[in-house]
Amino acid sequence: MGSFWRICASERLKMSKSYIWLLVILSPAIAILPGALSIRDGEEVTWGLLLSVMSVVHGLLFLPVLSGIFAALICRYEHQDGGWKLLLSLPVTRMKVYLSKYVMIIALLGVVQLLFLVCLLGMGWIRDAAAPVPWSILLFSVFGGWIACLPLAALQLAVSQGWSSFGAPLALNVSLTIPNILIANSATYGPYYPWVQPSLAMTPNGQDGFGAFNLPLDSLMIVVLGSLIVFLVAGLFFFWRKAV
């Protein structure tokens, strides 16, 4: 177990030399804009309103894109100058290497979600949202969005470690994120589309009663956990057979 955390520490050290931390604050910062502009005629600003409008931009567009960017950056160093061969020649197992990269991706996404919560609380304070703060709703939304990112992160890691090109996985990820607005309207396909799941998990119940947003959270989590197992096992299998 100690070797696994040492690999994680080395991954963190590699990421500290990049501009990845600027990307971490990107989506929460952009989500501030719709929160600042949200208003309904004759209605007071509520925490549910702020969470709804800020999570649309954050969960529907930027969070899925960030998962792909993080995965591509995590694998970028190994794709250069025979990095995979050098890394796997060390006394470490492929499973530990793969899982350490996955842990780094979901840790970065966790930091993104925490920053989103901070921005949401700050915007609520600035807009003088109706008290008290609904901590249970906000925390369930933020944590649920992070959980819903886990299968997408596993899928993106599987693609990024398999393709040596840095831009190809990103282009694929963006192209599959763009249809989110349409797919989220489908109660049939929306819950099973990994790029939509973070937004579905983050949207407060009762705010968007249409399409896949009608799906109960517990049913969505069953789909998410099932997808996570499939994508993570498949990624490990292909990485285990990867020629270096």
Predicted regions and their residues:
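Membrane-helix interface segments
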Residues: 19-20, 81, 93-95, 99, ...
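Secretory targeting signals
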Residues: 29-67, 99-163, 207, 214-218
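Aromatic- and glycine-rich beta-strand/loop motifs that create alpha-glucan
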Residues: 1-25
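Hydrophobic alpha-helical transmembrane segments of multi-pass membrane transport/permease proteins
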Residues: 17-41, 55-70, 171-181, 226
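Terminal transmembrane helical anchor/hairpin motif
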Residues: 34, 38-50, 170-244
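Transmembrane helix-loop junction
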Residues: 77, 90, 121-125, 161, ...
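Functionally important transmembrane alpha-helices
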Residues: 151-181
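Helix-loop-helix units of permease transmembrane domains in multi-pass membrane transporters
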Residues: 74-106
